[in-house]
Structure formats: structure tokens, C-alpha cells
Amino acid sequence: MKISIREKDIGMFKAIDVSCKDGVIVLDFDCANCGVPMVNSRPIVPVPMVSPLKDLNHLTWSEIEAIGAAGKARETFALGATKKDHMKNGYDAEWKIIGFDHDDLADGSGKAPISWDMVRAYKDEWSMNDEATNAGGWDWCKARKRMDGELLSLCSDELQAIIKPVIKLTSAGSCSKDIIKSICKLWLKSEKELFGRCIYSAPGEGHWYEYYRQEDVPYFALDENGDRVCQWLRSAYYYSDNSFCSVWTDGSAASNRATSSGALLPGFSC
């Protein structure tokens, strides 16, 4: 079976041969003159023949991106499949797949093949703003700017290379139902994307991620030690002008003042 995919860095089309040999799936990349280090160093990629795959640590981020670009993500990867990324500050982040073809690409070309969020909360807690305000919602808040700057820069270079900007919908805050479109590389989930409904947030902030629609999937967050923590959502709290939505340690919907410290479980799309 031959699949044609677009290699975005060079604007050319490359071919992938997919075959089965000795009990493994073999992805054979045609890498002549393509200038992609991942392909040049590993032209043949063995994948254990377990489908869909749950542990993706034997694949590089570039290989995962290529499978998504070929339209094969859903049949190749399990919902909830995980991969670790060694960050530049020494933190080992683990990411899980929470959806396929869910997020709108910022360039208008369609849907991002795969959406991810962090399995355990990031090691540092952040506030959403320096002042107790949700004016401007996610689009204006300090945490969004830090996430797409400081936090993104700490991800491995390989992960940064495959993250695609997407459009995230969030209310304008200050008890408004107006929806702002934010272009993000890293983002927090909205209340609707996590719980599937608006509890303390304004309507129109995206759609329920497939992973969180499953029965027995917890909404609460754990830190790197396995302790439950209160996590931030990007949704402005609809009933006041000083808070953002959050998730309490029992997994219930809550809110906290924008100046409070809370756990981050960032997401991205590729």
C-alpha cells in the first residue's frame, strides 16, 4: 500500500510504503533529498504490530506527524495513546491523544489530525493573570502568552517543529457571551471541551474532546507525584469578572480567582 503525504518543510510530496514483515508494520520513507533528519537517520521505521498503538515512545514526533498527515492517525493510534517528551528544563512531560480531526488549523486548511494534552500536570503552578480579572478571556490573559512563549520554548525542538497553530474559541470574559478566536500552539482546554457542557462558562467554547466522552475517564488532574491537584481551564468564569474556570481535585467543575495558582495540563495539535 502506498500513501502520498506532503512534507511541509520542503513543499514536496514524498511517498511512504507500508508493509508487514516478520510480524511488524514497516513504514518505508522515500527520503531522497528531503532534508528531514528524522527520515535520513531512520529510513525504515519498525512498529510493533499492535493496532491501534497505545505506547508511542518508539516513534519520533516527526513519524507521528507523518502518519497523521497521511490520514492514518485514527486507525494507527489509540485514543489515549501516550508519548514522552524530554523538555529543555529537564522535565519529562508525557502527552496523550485526546482527539482526531478535532481542532481547526489556523491557516484555514482543515482540521489538525491529532490533538493532545499533558497526562500529568506540569511541574509549576501558574496564575492566569497578575490581577484579579478575566477581561479579554483567554486571549488576553498572561498564562496564554507565557504558554506560547516560555513553555513552548522549553519543549524539545522536535516537538516544537510539529506543533500546528489552531483556533481556540473562548468568551471575552467580564460576563460576556462574545466569543474570541485565539490562535494558539499550546492551549488549555475549555470547560466545554473537558466536560462536554457549559457549567460555569459561556456557550460556544468548542466541542467535547473524544477522549473525555469515554466512560470512567476521570476529569481530575494528577501531578508528577500522583497527587490530585486543582487544574486551570481557559474558560472565563461567566458569573464574575475576576475568575477563570477550573477543575477541583474531585473532578468537579469549579472556579478560582485569576491571581490564584493552579495546575496546568497544556494541549497541542499536530
PLM feature spans:
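Collagenous Gly-X-Y triple-helix signature in extracellular proteins
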Residues: 47-270
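Short, low-complexity N-terminal tether/leader segments at secretion or assembly junctions of large
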Residues: 1-47
